[in-house]
Amino acid sequence: VQIALGNHDLDHKDTMEIGTAYEKRFRMPHVQPAIRNLATNDLFYKGETPDFEYFQAKTFVPYEFGNAYYSFVFGPSKHIVLSSYSSFLPGSIQHEWLLSELEHVDRSVTPWLIIMLHCPLYSTFHDHKREIFMTEARVHLEPVFVRHRVNFVVAGHLHSYMRTVPTIDSKPDPRGPIHIIQGNGGRQANEPYINDTVAEEWIKVRDHSMYGYGTLELFNRTHARWKWVKTGFNAEDEGGLHGRFQPDFSLNDEVWVTNQLYVDEDPIPDESLEM
């Protein structure tokens, strides 16, 4: 199991430690041992209720390497897992590591390039939309992903499902990555949409009512298939609470993807690649 650092992994509000349980519980393919420093109060929003036991970060935390970010190869795919909560701004340790990783990817060996991180770059949902971990990623990471023809950017954070068409700078473009939010695996949240009636032009599928999981099959160097399978939903509210779980194991979204690396279009304009 390969996972990405989430806001729920930033540890207990009383310890001021970063990622201690996350480092001890999981073992990812380390680039090098983790570098973690104690947090300071100004890094976090503190919960207003006594039972709020973990941090909500408002800026980047002092956590590098270890389980925070890493990469691995699986068959014909190169996977790069990033930390949304370690700085990824230009010149940061993580950003420099990411650039080095991407520059050394051999697409003749691993033609599929997949990025995973907790916070999405694109979201049709209202919650978290102003967090810097999303807004700054669009500014500083999207141009890098586009330049290197990343195929998929897979995230969570929002407890719902979303799939975009290949997108560059908020416009459908066959050369751009497909952005997926697969955050509806367990927690019911009914994330509100930014616009209830009309989805953004880069949206292909969005859903905030179902639980589910996704699968990605890589058939060859040019074609892959993504599926989102729903597992159920909560019935109508009962007494102000979420209703009883209703199983429903049916296919809810399926798409065949042509590897963007082989899309023959005009070169991507230089201004789209600026960091």
Give the label of every model feature segment.
Residues V1-L113, H128-L141, M162-D207, G212-E217:
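Extended active-site neighborhood of metal-dependent phosphoesterases/phosphodiesterases
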Residues Y122:
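ATP-dependent adenylate-handling ligase core
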Residues S170-D270, M275:
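Binuclear metal-dependent phosphoesterase catalytic core
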